[in-house]
Amino acid sequence: MKVASSLVGGRDPSPELAAEVVHNALQAAGVERADSVLLFLSRDYVRHAQPAIIAAARAAGTTQISGCTAYGLLNEQGWLLDQSGAVALVIAQSPAPATGDRREPLLSFSGHHTLPYDWQALPARAGLLDAEAVAWAHGRLAGTPGAEVRLPGMHARLASSPGLRLLGLPLTVTATTGYDLRQLGGLAAVDSLQRCLPAGLHAGAPHRP
Protein backbone atom coordinates (compact mmCIF):
# COMPACT_ATOMS: atom_id res chain seq x y z
CA MET A 1 0.00 0.00 0.00
CA LYS A 2 1.17 3.52 -0.80
CA VAL A 3 -0.25 6.60 0.91
CA ALA A 4 0.64 10.29 0.62
CA SER A 5 -0.98 13.67 1.16
CA SER A 6 -0.78 17.17 -0.26
CA LEU A 7 -2.06 20.60 0.77
CA VAL A 8 -2.61 23.40 -1.75
CA GLY A 9 -3.92 26.94 -1.32
CA GLY A 10 -5.28 29.33 -3.94
CA ARG A 11 -7.23 32.51 -4.56
CA ASP A 12 -10.52 30.94 -5.67
CA PRO A 13 -12.45 27.69 -5.03
CA SER A 14 -11.67 26.23 -8.45
CA PRO A 15 -11.76 22.63 -9.76
CA GLU A 16 -8.16 23.09 -10.87
CA LEU A 17 -7.09 23.43 -7.23
CA ALA A 18 -8.65 20.04 -6.42
CA ALA A 19 -6.95 18.43 -9.40
CA GLU A 20 -3.61 19.97 -8.44
CA VAL A 21 -3.72 18.72 -4.85
CA VAL A 22 -4.50 15.17 -6.00
CA HIS A 23 -1.75 15.29 -8.63
CA ASN A 24 0.76 16.45 -6.01
CA ALA A 25 -0.28 13.68 -3.61
CA LEU A 26 0.08 11.07 -6.37
CA GLN A 27 3.58 12.33 -7.09
CA ALA A 28 4.45 12.15 -3.39
CA ALA A 29 3.21 8.54 -3.28
CA GLY A 30 5.13 7.65 -6.43
CA VAL A 31 2.05 6.37 -8.28
CA GLU A 32 0.03 7.41 -11.32
CA ARG A 33 -3.44 6.60 -10.00
CA ALA A 34 -5.15 6.01 -6.67
CA ASP A 35 -7.57 3.38 -5.42
CA SER A 36 -9.29 5.97 -3.24
CA VAL A 37 -8.88 9.58 -2.15
CA LEU A 38 -9.89 11.51 0.94
CA LEU A 39 -10.47 15.07 -0.30
CA PHE A 40 -11.23 18.01 1.98
CA LEU A 41 -12.04 21.45 0.61
CA SER A 42 -12.23 24.89 2.21
CA ARG A 43 -15.61 26.34 3.20
CA ASP A 44 -15.92 28.48 0.05
CA TYR A 45 -16.34 25.26 -1.97
CA VAL A 46 -19.82 24.69 -0.49
CA ARG A 47 -21.47 25.85 -3.75
CA HIS A 48 -18.69 24.57 -5.99
CA ALA A 49 -18.00 21.12 -4.57
CA GLN A 50 -19.21 18.82 -7.36
CA PRO A 51 -16.99 20.26 -10.14
CA ALA A 52 -14.03 20.00 -7.76
CA ILE A 53 -14.87 16.37 -6.94
CA ILE A 54 -15.07 15.52 -10.65
CA ALA A 55 -11.70 17.19 -11.27
CA ALA A 56 -10.16 15.26 -8.38
CA ALA A 57 -11.59 11.98 -9.67
CA ARG A 58 -10.13 12.57 -13.13
CA ALA A 59 -6.73 13.41 -11.67
CA ALA A 60 -6.77 10.35 -9.41
CA GLY A 61 -8.15 7.90 -11.97
CA THR A 62 -10.86 6.73 -9.57
CA THR A 63 -14.40 7.66 -8.56
CA GLN A 64 -13.68 6.73 -4.93
CA ILE A 65 -13.46 10.34 -3.75
CA SER A 66 -14.80 11.02 -0.25
CA GLY A 67 -14.64 13.92 2.19
CA CYS A 68 -16.30 17.24 3.01
CA THR A 69 -15.82 20.98 3.30
CA ALA A 70 -14.20 22.31 6.47
CA TYR A 71 -13.28 25.62 8.08
CA GLY A 72 -9.59 24.72 8.24
CA LEU A 73 -7.37 22.30 6.35
CA LEU A 74 -4.16 20.60 7.47
CA ASN A 75 -1.74 17.79 6.79
CA GLU A 76 1.72 16.89 8.06
CA GLN A 77 3.23 19.74 6.04
CA GLY A 78 1.13 22.67 7.23
CA TRP A 79 -2.34 24.21 7.47
CA LEU A 80 -4.69 26.71 5.81
CA LEU A 81 -7.26 29.09 7.29
CA ASP A 82 -9.33 31.89 5.69
CA GLN A 83 -8.15 30.93 2.21
CA SER A 84 -9.35 28.76 -0.64
CA GLY A 85 -7.64 25.42 -0.47
CA ALA A 86 -7.73 21.66 -0.74
CA VAL A 87 -6.03 18.77 1.02
CA ALA A 88 -5.94 15.22 -0.30
CA LEU A 89 -4.82 11.84 0.99
CA VAL A 90 -4.33 9.32 -1.80
CA ILE A 91 -4.36 5.58 -1.13
CA ALA A 92 -2.92 3.31 -3.80
CA GLN A 93 -2.13 -0.37 -4.23
CA SER A 94 -4.28 -1.26 -1.24
CA PRO A 95 -4.74 -5.00 -0.59
CA ALA A 96 -8.14 -6.56 -1.11
CA PRO A 97 -10.05 -6.73 2.20
CA ALA A 98 -10.98 -10.09 3.62
CA THR A 99 -14.64 -11.04 3.29
CA GLY A 100 -16.62 -9.52 6.14
CA ASP A 101 -13.56 -7.69 7.53
CA ARG A 102 -14.95 -4.87 9.64
CA ARG A 103 -11.65 -3.63 11.02
CA GLU A 104 -11.51 -1.10 8.22
CA PRO A 105 -12.13 2.36 9.72
CA LEU A 106 -15.59 3.80 9.05
CA LEU A 107 -15.34 7.50 8.22
CA SER A 108 -18.47 9.64 8.33
CA PHE A 109 -19.04 13.27 7.30
CA SER A 110 -22.27 15.19 7.85
CA GLY A 111 -23.69 18.69 7.45
CA HIS A 112 -26.30 18.13 10.19
CA HIS A 113 -26.59 20.30 13.29
CA THR A 114 -26.54 17.17 15.45
CA LEU A 115 -25.21 13.65 15.05
CA PRO A 116 -27.64 11.74 12.79
CA TYR A 117 -29.78 9.28 14.74
CA ASP A 118 -28.67 6.27 12.70
CA TRP A 119 -25.04 7.08 13.51
CA GLN A 120 -25.49 7.06 17.28
CA ALA A 121 -25.22 3.27 17.56
CA LEU A 122 -22.43 0.90 16.59
CA PRO A 123 -20.29 0.61 14.56
CA ALA A 124 -17.87 3.20 15.90
CA ARG A 125 -17.07 6.08 13.55
CA ALA A 126 -14.58 8.85 13.01
CA GLY A 127 -15.16 11.92 10.89
CA LEU A 128 -16.54 15.45 10.92
CA LEU A 129 -19.87 16.96 11.94
CA ASP A 130 -20.35 20.56 10.73
CA ALA A 131 -23.75 22.24 10.47
CA GLU A 132 -22.77 24.05 7.25
CA ALA A 133 -20.62 21.40 5.58
CA VAL A 134 -21.18 19.67 2.27
CA ALA A 135 -20.09 16.01 2.23
CA TRP A 136 -19.40 13.49 -0.53
CA ALA A 137 -18.61 9.82 -1.00
CA HIS A 138 -17.80 7.67 -4.06
CA GLY A 139 -17.41 10.81 -6.16
CA ARG A 140 -20.90 12.21 -5.49
CA LEU A 141 -22.43 14.72 -3.12
CA ALA A 142 -24.13 12.93 -0.24
CA GLY A 143 -27.71 13.40 0.89
CA THR A 144 -29.15 12.59 4.30
CA PRO A 145 -27.62 11.77 6.74
CA GLY A 146 -24.22 12.32 5.12
CA ALA A 147 -21.24 10.54 3.59
CA GLU A 148 -19.88 7.21 4.81
CA VAL A 149 -16.81 5.39 3.54
CA ARG A 150 -14.56 2.56 4.64
CA LEU A 151 -10.87 2.63 3.77
CA PRO A 152 -10.14 -0.68 2.01
CA GLY A 153 -7.21 -2.71 3.21
CA MET A 154 -6.64 -0.59 6.31
CA HIS A 155 -7.00 -1.82 9.88
CA ALA A 156 -7.48 0.74 12.63
CA ARG A 157 -8.37 1.16 16.27
CA LEU A 158 -10.32 4.25 17.29
CA ALA A 159 -9.06 6.22 20.28
CA SER A 160 -10.80 9.19 21.88
CA SER A 161 -9.36 12.21 23.67
CA PRO A 162 -10.77 13.18 27.08
CA GLY A 163 -10.51 16.83 26.07
CA LEU A 164 -8.34 19.79 27.01
CA ARG A 165 -6.32 19.83 30.20
CA LEU A 166 -4.86 22.87 31.95
CA LEU A 167 -1.10 22.33 32.24
CA GLY A 168 -0.11 25.38 34.26
CA LEU A 169 -0.41 29.12 34.76
CA PRO A 170 -0.64 31.50 31.78
CA LEU A 171 2.72 32.35 30.17
CA THR A 172 3.77 35.42 28.22
CA VAL A 173 4.40 34.89 24.51
CA THR A 174 7.92 36.23 23.98
CA ALA A 175 8.60 35.25 20.35
CA THR A 176 6.63 34.28 17.24
CA THR A 177 7.24 33.80 13.54
CA GLY A 178 4.04 34.72 11.77
CA TYR A 179 1.39 32.51 13.39
CA ASP A 180 3.97 30.02 14.69
CA LEU A 181 4.72 30.12 18.41
CA ARG A 182 8.47 30.20 19.14
CA GLN A 183 8.92 31.17 22.81
CA LEU A 184 6.85 31.26 25.99
CA GLY A 185 8.19 32.99 29.07
CA GLY A 186 11.63 33.19 27.49
CA LEU A 187 11.80 29.44 26.78
CA ALA A 188 11.51 27.68 23.45
CA ALA A 189 7.91 26.53 23.01
CA VAL A 190 8.83 22.84 23.14
CA ASP A 191 10.95 23.35 26.29
CA SER A 192 8.08 25.22 27.92
CA LEU A 193 5.75 22.33 27.12
CA GLN A 194 8.20 19.80 28.55
CA ARG A 195 8.42 21.78 31.79
CA CYS A 196 4.63 21.92 32.22
CA LEU A 197 3.82 18.30 31.36
CA PRO A 198 3.12 15.80 34.15
CA ALA A 199 5.98 13.32 34.62
CA GLY A 200 4.02 10.45 33.09
CA LEU A 201 3.62 12.26 29.76
CA HIS A 202 7.24 13.28 29.14
CA ALA A 203 8.04 10.23 27.00
CA GLY A 204 5.40 11.03 24.38
CA ALA A 205 6.03 14.77 24.21
CA PRO A 206 7.61 16.44 21.16
CA HIS A 207 11.32 17.21 21.35
CA ARG A 208 13.47 19.93 19.92
CA PRO A 209 14.75 18.86 16.46
Regions found by a protein language model. Give the residues of each.
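Small-residue-enriched flexible segments
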Residues: 1-36, 40-46, 50, 55-57, ...
